[in-house]
Amino acid sequence: MQVTGSIKFDLKVDDQLLPRARALREQWGASERPVWIAASTHEGEDALILQAHQQLLQAHGDALLILVPRHPERFDAVHALCCGQFATVRRSAGAAVDGQTRVLLGDTMGELLFLYALADIAFVGGSLVATGGHNPLEPAALALPVIMGPHVFNFLEISAMLRDAGALQQVDDAQGLAEAVRQLIELPQDARRMGEAGRAVMQANQGALQRLLDGLARLIR
């Protein structure tokens, strides 16, 4: 028997992803704006995230939130929720973010890594509600500081590794989320340190897929 490790660490990031994201932020005129993403969110969580964004805007009035619901059937309802409070652009509509936009709704499929790449700070959803959280290695692979709520039971070991390395911070509620994002905006050296720690965890644990393939090759010889 051989333990190969988790293939989740073997996430490959396209070399053009970050340059494409930087170019789009420049096109938006948002290179200097604080941008944070709340990704893979669930019902009951979006309202908490928008509450956190409202609090954040009191300190950083130009902050942009990229909100990405986990399930496509919720896109319209979450869009309505956003529009009730903020100037909102739907990614699927192809409209550009401008200086008045406060929320970009990530309502497209297959773009999650690119949407992460547009951000400076990442909140991974399914964790402020008792869903168990989603994969924090996706933002870690892009050297983003990662925030999650208290419910991470789907990724207990991985979240513990990132937390112990100083790459992931957990918060309990909307107020804690707003405060965590605010601090990372105001202390960019801390944000960089968290991001670099996450990428180091990724790199230190890569190779499981190749070990698995090598093991399978030996078995079928």
Protein language model features and the residues they cover:
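Nucleotide-activated sugar donor-binding and catalytic core shared by glycosyltransferases
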Residues: 1-221
